[in-house]
Amino acid sequence: TRIERLERQAQQWHLVDSQQTLHGPYDQVIVAVPPAQAAPLLAGVANLVAPASNSSMEPGWAVAITLPQKLDSSADAVFVRSGPLDWIAREASKPGRANSENWVLQSTPAWAEAHLDDDPAQIVDALVAAMGEVLGIHIPTPVFQQAHRWLYARPAADCEWGALAAPEQGIYVCGDWCLGGRLGAA
């Protein structure tokens, strides 16, 4: 169910969905969505709508692959930040992960923007080829592959809104766009 707006009535919040169904009442609401989706929800809360309206996000493609054998590369993670690739990581090098040859590939925002509507299989092919170039080795055909497009992958600029809240109204906002583009900032 997609919530389209928040309404404050008698010191409580009601959520209105795309079918105009009313949900609630709620004493408090936490808005944990990208700024483009948060701004319309926060329209009635002046000190919260401005940060959401003035923040933008960049897209990204993430690809997960499993290879049939271990790559002959000492690299476990590489910040590439050029061409199609921003980051590649060997998952088995992380504590507590499976020993299979799983990799995560993340695109640069500019490349993702240029390829937003491409077929996911084409995205996998392009990023795997770029990975081979970065590592300087042949990458065998993956036995598993999956691509996911993130329209709102990370903040377009560094931001330091910090905690966004109107506690007197019982509304709180969180997300990486409030403090920075990495998981810990969310």
Residue ranges and their predicted role:
Residues 2-14:
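A conserved short coil-to-beta-strand element within the FAD-binding core of flavoproteins
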Residues 185-186:
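An active-site-proximal "capping" alpha-helix that borders the catalytic cofactor pocket
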